[in-house]
Amino acid sequence: TGFLGAGKTTLLRALLSSPDAADTAVIVNEFGEIGLDHHLLVGASETMYLLENGCVCCTQRDDLEASLEDLYWARLRREIPWFSRVVVETTGLADPSGVFAMVSGDTLAGIRYVWQSVVTLVDGVNGSETLEAHAAGAQQAAMADHLIISKTDLAADIGDLRRRLQILNSDARLHQASRGALGASLDALMQPAPGADARRLGLSGGPLHDAGITSCWLHFRPSLPRLEFDAAFADLTEKFGVDLLRAKGIAHFAGDPKPSVLQYVAGGTIEITPADLAADAPAGLVVIASKVSPGEVENIFVAHGLGPYLMAEDHKGHAH
């Protein structure tokens, strides 16, 4: 787990590329309506489930339990490669206590599976601000057996963040990662911290989603003009500032031979990277923001002449 844009998918892909992760099934939970993380992880695991458009700790909790049950029986029937563990990548807004309660309680998941650990990524650049401003980010850190400070290559100083994390959760093992590179294996990250389960029970108080956070999904047509997109996104960041928490998506820009992956984290700049993706990878952009309506986001793109490139969709704001 880890707050929006902390680098969960980058780290998970790196961990799954190791030979000791060959027997790992993966469940990816996405907040928005586009399963981008699922597409970025394709090939990293032979056994993968996608839970999109909701959080596993509330709207998708039943679906998570059903997916775990499906995996269990498909494994026994040899319909999928044999696995010895399941990794769940939650949304950036999820409180992991709900997943912990389900797997540790008197449920089918609790009977089939044994809980191991919570691994929480904290953005080395924005982590201190996230812990102060967002209850979900602080809860994720407090629940962790392993705390990983990510993006250390981009952070000027992580001393203050380390001190904050030690105060918030002194039991967790602290790691550092850069571009997905971590000096610990998946096996090591599955080891629980001493006394962690008792501490987690005390922290399990129900969902802590930040009020007013919404997501919207803009569906792009092919041959999206790059200059107009760049200008529209620049206006988006200028208008909403830190309230624009996260944006991620896939675009097929005019004249480019490959689709591009779009990634943005609050306070940064958008990263646009050509990528080899599956043919069915959906083109579009998920925008996750605080106190911003989907209509406001769409209007900015329309104002830059991108209206004809936006396919008609039922844009939704998901209040958590």
List the predicted regions and their residue ranges.
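Flexible loop/N-cap segments at domain edges
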Residues: 287
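C-terminal accessory "lid"/substrate-recognition subdomains
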Residues: 139-280, 290-320
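Amphipathic coiled-coil/heptad-repeat helices and related helical stalk/stem segments
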Residues: 64, 133, 158-161
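Extended, well-folded catalytic/binding cores that form a central cleft or groove in large enzyme
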Residues: 113, 128-133, 140, 168-171
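Nucleotide-state-sensitive switch-loop elements of NTP-binding domains
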Residues: 1, 6, 10-130
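Structural motif
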Residues: 78, 110, 136-139, 208
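Conserved phosphate/pyrophosphate-binding and hydrolysis machinery centered on Walker-type P-loop NTPases
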Residues: 93, 134, 219-223
